[in-house]
């Protein structure tokens, strides 16, 4: 694994859910690294099935994590300064808004809110799921908590997500 990290902007925890855009997670990692971020990748356990873990670890220089570390061991990642979650599923959206931290990814997102970190979220949800009342309420609550939501189903219907460049641009604005 590479040990060279560009971190002029800080340490970004990039969270990935199980949705088709997870297959292109390396595209966002490349952009973020080129933009000066040191990227650490979190994934839901199911999202790891969509991702090319060896490529992501090579690009980021850090292990991809989907499970908690062993109690009593040192953390293998540097301290987070900002977060992005893309693609974000209905399941993660509603659980996060409720403060449910039943996996590492959700735990870190809940912690990020508590720390007041800049967080950008880009849901990737098909139309039937987006019409569930819990989805809209959850987006409203997350916005009220300060999360920068990028959701444009008219221009980027699932399985598309808002372009990686727009996500990075919003992250850079939020982190200023």
For each of these PLM feature ranges, what is it?
Residues 1-176:
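A cross-family phosphate/adenosyl-ligand binding-site feature
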């Amino acid at each position: 694994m590479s040990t060279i990290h560009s971190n002029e902007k800080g340490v970004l925890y990039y969270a990935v859910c199980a949705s088709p855009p997870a297959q292109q997670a390396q595209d966002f990692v490349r952009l973020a690294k080129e933009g000066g971020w040191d990227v650490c990748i979190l994934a839901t356990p199911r999202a790891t099935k969509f991702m090319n873990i060896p490529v992501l670890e090579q690009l980021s220089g850090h292990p991809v994590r989907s499970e908690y570390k062993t109690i009593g061991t040192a953390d293998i990642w540097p301290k987070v300064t900002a977060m992005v979650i893309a693609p974000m599923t209905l399941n993660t959206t509603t659980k996060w808004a409720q403060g449910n931290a039943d996996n590492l990814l959700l735990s870190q997102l809940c912690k990020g809110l508590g720390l007041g970190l800049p967080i950008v979220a880009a849901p990737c949800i098909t139309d039937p799921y987006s019409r569930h009342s819990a989805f809209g309420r959850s987006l409203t609550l997350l916005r009220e908590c300060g999360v920068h939501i990028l959701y444009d189903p008219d221009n980027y219907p699932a399985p598309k997500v808002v372009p990686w460049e727009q996500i990075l641009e919003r992250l850079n604005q939020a982190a200023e």
